[in-house]
């Protein structure tokens, strides 16, 4: 039994085609054509090899033979034709929209004929949202697919899903086609795996310490000293793939005013949050993309950094006057906002630090705490003003996900819709012909978003994995969730 990262909490189903949120179970139920390693390199999986034409307009994949879905159906080129078609017009259509059609020269060759060059296609194909389900089972289940039944070719099968609580998986004993991301190419050693969602970090720590769970993925940094003091607990710290940030609702007053957004952003001290909430583990975030991406290397003048003097000056000039109680007001309206956060410990503590920092600006931020499912419902309804949020994603196209107008109201819960932003988005997403062009275009896109203060970057964490070292044996190279198949139980 293991506890999954809270960024995956509340996943409503295990349908990669129609979901906007999936938990780690989806990586284990489904395989993908290619897999991306922790070092960002790509490895063959259901595609044994692939070639791209010089102009980028055709991609040819040689498919692995002998693969079968959990329902016994064969995997072949016809599967790929059906699979790509299922994304059309759906929530994840952007993953395949550069593909015009799929040709099948033979039973185990699939050729993508492109509408345009799309250097990022290889990344898309490795996404958790591009796990390949069984056509037969998917079509038979209809809209209910992914809740009771989820049929892939992966090392685990879905036994049950209780949304917001746990996902139970059982080993696929017929599995013989593991990728290079795992040492074990066959059936998992752990035969029944429960992925639990425990939002409170203290509870998760106690469960690990007492043997209630065997592994916790995404351990808060402040627990590391306690964990390392336990003789029966091992810890692995891996490069993080996400950013914690503040989200503005740009359509909700007072954050519809760029001056208020800018002042709020400059009033937030990332260094204090790193020290107080994350015990100095990880790094400060000053832009939206993770620092390992080349696209994150923006001109430093666009980075969002703490400057309380300038923040106060901006509001003074904009007519937000301080009252005798220290709270600013303009046109009779006090500067009071709702600060939404999730119940998980790091989210709540971050909100409390931000609340105190905004008080120094003359802004009252009332903290309202939600569970992971309810807060997403609030985002979809546009009922939020300011929120502590987090994403895990290692590609610049996360900017499309959160800031493209087509994704309003969710996942673009910033409600950001701006002509110049859309223009830069389209150039980066649709007109980049080579990888270098794509990097340059995404830098420009992010620099514009930074200049509009549609978010406040806070912290870039590491991924801490703690496990019961007396019960579980892990490889030296451990990259969850792929490496779960390598974990063995000490008898």
Predicted regions mapped to residue ranges:
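Ligand-site clamp/hinge motif
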Residues: 147, 175-226, 355, 363-366, ...
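Structural transition elements
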Residues: 156, 249, 284-324, 342-349
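Extracellular/periplasmic solute-recognition and catalytic clefts
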Residues: 83, 94, 101-104, 159-170, ...
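A structural "hinge/loop" feature
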Residues: 7-26, 46-48, 73, 121-130, ...
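Surface-exposed binding/hinge segments that line
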Residues: 62, 94-138, 146-150, 155-162, ...
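N-terminal lobe/hinge region of extracytoplasmic solute-binding protein
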Residues: 5-54, 79, 85, 151
């Amino acid at each position: 039994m293991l506890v999954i990262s809270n960024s995956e909490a509340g996943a409503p189903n295990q349908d990669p085609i129609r979901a906007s949120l999936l938990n780690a179970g989806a990586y284990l139920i489904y395989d993908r054509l290619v897999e991306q390693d922790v070092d960002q390199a790509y490895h063959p999986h259901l595609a044994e090899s692939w070639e791209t034409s010089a102009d980028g307009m055709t991609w040819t994949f040689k498919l692995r033979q002998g693969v079968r879905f959990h329902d016994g159906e064969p995997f072949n080129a016809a599967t790929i034709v059906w699979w790509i078609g299922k994304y059309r017009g759906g929530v994840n259509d952007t993953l395949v929209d550069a593909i015009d059609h799929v040709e099948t020269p033979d039973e185990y060759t699939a050729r993508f004929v492109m509408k345009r060059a799309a250097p990022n296609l290889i990344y898309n194909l490795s996404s958790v949202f591009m796990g390949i389900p069984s056509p037969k089972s998917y079509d038979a289940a209809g809209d209910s697919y992914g809740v009771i039944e989820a049929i892939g070719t992966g090392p685990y099968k879905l036994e049950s899903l209780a949304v917001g609580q746990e996902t139970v998986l059982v080993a696929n004993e017929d599995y013989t086609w593991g990728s290079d991301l795992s040492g074990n190419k066959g059936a998992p050693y752990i035969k029944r795996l429960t992925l639990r969602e425990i939002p409170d970090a203290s509870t998760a720590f106690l469960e690990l310490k007492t043997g209630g769970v065997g592994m916790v993925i995404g351990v808060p940094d402040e627990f590391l000293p306690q964990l390392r003091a336990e003789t029966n607990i091992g810890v692995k710290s891996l490069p993080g793939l996400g950013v914690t940030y503040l989200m503005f609702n740009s359509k909700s007053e007072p954050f519809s005013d760029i001056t208020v957004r800018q002042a709020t952003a400059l009033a937030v001290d990332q260094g204090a949050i790193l020290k107080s909430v994350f015990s100095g583990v990880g790094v400060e975030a000053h832009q939206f993309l993770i620092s390992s991406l080349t696209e994150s290397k923006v001109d430093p003048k666009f980075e969002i950094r703490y400057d309380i003097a300038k923040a106060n000056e901006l509001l003074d000039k904009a007519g937000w006057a301080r009252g005798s109680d220290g709270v600013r007001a303009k046109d009779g309206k006090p500067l009071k906002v709702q600060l939404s956060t999730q119940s998980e410990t790091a989210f709540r503590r971050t909100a409390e630090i931000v609340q105190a920092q905004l008080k120094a600006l003359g802004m009252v931020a009332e903290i309202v705490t939600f569970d992971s499912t309810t807060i997403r419902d609030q985002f979809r309804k546009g009922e939020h003003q300011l929120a502590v949020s987090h994403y895990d994603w290692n590609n610049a196209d996360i900017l499309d996900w959160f800031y493209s107008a087509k994704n309003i109201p969710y996942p673009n819960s910033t409600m950001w819709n701006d002509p110049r932003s859309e223009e830069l988005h389209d150039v980066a997403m649709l007109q980049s012909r080579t990888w270098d062009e794509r990097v340059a275009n995404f830098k420009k896109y992010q620099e514009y978003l930074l200049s509009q203060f549609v978010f406040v970057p806070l912290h870039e964490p590491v991924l801490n994995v703690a496990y019961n070292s007396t019960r579980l044996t892990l490889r030296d190279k451990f990259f969850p969730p792929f490496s779960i198949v390598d974990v063995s139980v000490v008898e």
